[in-house]
């Protein structure tokens, strides 16, 4: 073959036969068992996570990253511009891993957790401005310095990316389309999952008969930046906290700590599907749990595992 600009079937027949027999390989669970039927992880494809402020977008992304480090030894590079100082972000990750605040852990637990987080997480200096190219160049620099290969990257929030509108005649839609294309290419050539976290646009409030007003879940074309996200996305996830004044499809009122994970787009075929499932926040452990076959499961737990009980009393002393 003279070049790689195009392919005849004969160039890919071996790969085709392998794929037809085995399908997608190396598909991984997010560690949240209730999501496995609609959402799985596949390296080489980006994930876009959206939601309103205070919906838990960052928390959900951190949960996936902690889970995949525990389950598969995955390593992560994170830009988190709205998570406080770098030490605050590390504190959050340590709390998730320990399932209790760092200062409540004994010295042995602290050392073990520090080693785990140090081995698997690098946090970018969010006081610096990054274009998407500069961000991925920084990821490559860290890989070279630490002699590691990152399995995921995360840029949160998307609107912190340095805008280069002058290259696109001042058109934000063209700039956005180009950035999302670069993210797609980055995931593919690096065989990793590049995560972008985005806000939603303004959603019109709904008023119930009793006068109660609430914001419904945003549609896929109601993310900040518009339908370009929908067009460019592979996996598109909305994190939504339903109001307790509403009931779910089974007629049961939503719980105060309930979050709906809504898969609004799923590509490639075979790794998920459009749908939704609820997960529940345990503020004390800083982790999510869910239900599978009516059994309570924390992240990384399976049906046969021993179950911890969630902390849902928000007035309870932490420890």
Walk through the language-model features, giving the residues of each:
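Signature of the SF2 helicase/ATPase Hel1-core->accessory helical subdomain module
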Residues: 160, 201-202
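The Walker A/P-loop phosphate-binding site
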Residues: 2-99, 318
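C-terminal regions of RecA-like/P-loop NTPase motor modules
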Residues: 1-14, 20-21, 53, 110-116, ...
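Cofactor-binding loop segments of dinucleotide-utilizing enzymes, especially the Rossmann-like FAD-
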Residues: 81, 199, 241
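Hydrophobic/aromatic beta-strand patches that form the interior of the parallel beta-sheet core
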Residues: 47-49, 77-79, 122-124, 195, ...
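Structural recognition of the conserved hydrophobic beta-strand(s) that form the central parallel beta-sheet
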Residues: 78, 154-155, 192-199
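A short alpha/beta connector and helix-capping loop motif
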Residues: 167-183, 193-197, 244
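Conserved inter-motif catalytic segment of the P-loop NTP-binding fold
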Residues: 30, 72-170, 178, 306-314, ...
């Amino acid at each position: 073959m003279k070049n790689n600009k195009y392919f005849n079937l004969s160039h890919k027949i071996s790969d085709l036969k392998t794929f037809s027999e085995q399908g997608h390989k190396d598909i991984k669970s997010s560690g949240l068992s209730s999501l496995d039927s609609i959402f799985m992880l596949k390296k080489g494809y980006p994930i876009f996570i959206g939601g309103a402020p205070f919906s838990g977008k960052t928390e959900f992304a951190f949960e996936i990253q902690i889970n995949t480090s525990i389950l598969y030894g995955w390593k992560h590079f994170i830009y988190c511009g709205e998570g406080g100082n770098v030490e605050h972000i590390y504190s959050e990750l340590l709390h998730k891993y320990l399932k209790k605040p760092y200062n409540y852990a004994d010295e042995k637990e602290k050392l073990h957790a520090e080693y785990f987080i140090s081995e698997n997480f690098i946090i970018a200096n969010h006081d610096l401005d990054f274009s998407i190219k500069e961000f991925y160049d920084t990821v490559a620099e860290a890989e070279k310095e630490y002699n590691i290969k990152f399995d995921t990257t995360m840029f949160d929030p998307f609107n912190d990316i340095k805008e280069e509108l002058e290259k696109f005649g001042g058109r934000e839609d063209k700039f956005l389309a180009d950035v999302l294309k670069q993210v797609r290419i980055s995931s593919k050539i690096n065989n990793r999952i590049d995560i972008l976290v985005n806000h939603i646009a303004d959603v019109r409030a709904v008023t119930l008969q009793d006068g109660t007003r609430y914001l419904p879940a945003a549609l896929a074309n109601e993310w900040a930046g518009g339908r370009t996200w929908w067009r460019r996305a592979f996996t598109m996830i909305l994190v939504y906290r339903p109001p307790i004044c509403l009931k779910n499809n089974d007629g049961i009122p939503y719980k105060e700590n309930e979050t709906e994970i809504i898969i609004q787009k799923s590509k490639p075929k075979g790794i998920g599907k459009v749908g939704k499932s609820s997960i529940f926040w345990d503020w004390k452990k800083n982790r999510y749990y869910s239900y599978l076959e009516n059994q309570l499961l924390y992240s990384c737990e399976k049906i046969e595992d021993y179950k911890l009980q969630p902390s849902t009393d928000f007035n309870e002393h932490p420890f």
